[in-house]
Design a protein with these regions (language model features):
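Polar/charged low-complexity regulatory segments
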Residues: 1-239
Length: 240
């Protein structure tokens, strides 16, 4: 299950990257290390534009975690889109980190890595979205939550990262972007009121994703086109 926890999983290498990127002197390094111990100050530091610039200019040689990488980039494009909720940004970062692994491009009960990677998974997207929606008819309440959350997440990922591929396929009869927006939004709305969402402190995140699905999707389009180029199956490599 995806949670809004990228920031809680940053590594020592991530904090070292922040200090090395932002410190101008040895004294700055000491101050930054102290400041990073405070969560509010840390969040403010994570918004520094130099972090994004350094990540983008050294994408193939980064000694950072994938959760740090995707949080910083997701936060950047979402803020550009006027979405400032850090918890929502954290969730989207976790979503990108999770779905960037090929074996997570399928529903929870079908974890077999697609041999043709991202693009192949997009080609089959509408098939197992339909399968998951059908599975809801026989699911328990807990399974219903997990399935609906996954449908919302998957719809956002496909329409956000693979929007050009999705549009091309829609010309040949496959579901279009509007289909994924509608399905994603409605499933996020439904899970927002679920007890499991309250227990996991995700009610506000799901409600925010439902109400701003279109805006978040456009921000991910920007991320895919300008920063990641995942729509062309050119996944950036990280040295982890």
């Amino acid at each position: 299950m995806i949670r809004a926890n990228c920031r809680a999983r940053f590594t020592a290498a991530d904090f070292d990257f922040i200090v090395r990127t932002l410190a101008r002197s040895r004294g700055d390094s000491v101050s930054l290390v102290d400041l990073l111990g405070d969560s509010e100050t840390r969040d403010s530091i994570l918004d520094h534009p130099r972090l994004v610039e350094t990540i983008l200019s050294n994408a193939g040689h980064l000694h950072i975690s994938s959760q740090f990488y995707f949080y910083v980039l997701a936060r950047y494009v979402l803020r550009q889109a006027g979405i400032g909720d850090r918890k929502l940004c954290d969730y989207v970062g976790s979503l990108l980190e999770t779905f960037s692994r090929a074996n997570q491009l399928q529903s929870p009960d079908k974890i077999d890595p697609p041999k043709d990677g991202f693009a192949g998974a997009n080609n089959r997207a509408h098939e197992y979205i339909s399968d998951m929606l059908i599975a809801l008819t026989r699911a328990t309440p807990e399974q219903t939550f997990l399935l609906r959350a996954h449908v919302g997440n998957y719809s956002l990922f496909i329409s956000g990262i693979f929007h050009e591929n999705t549009q091309r396929r829609s010309l040949r009869g496959a579901p279009d972007i509007e289909f994924y927006e509608k399905v994603g939004r409605s499933n996020y709305q439904l899970v927002a009121s679920h007890e499991t969402a309250r227990r996991c402190e995700l009610t506000d995140v799901f409600a925010g994703l439902a109400s701003r699905f279109h805006d978040v999707r456009l921000a991910l389009n920007e991320l895919s086109d300008r920063l990641l180029h995942l729509d062309e199956d050119a996944r950036p490599s990280l040295v982890l």
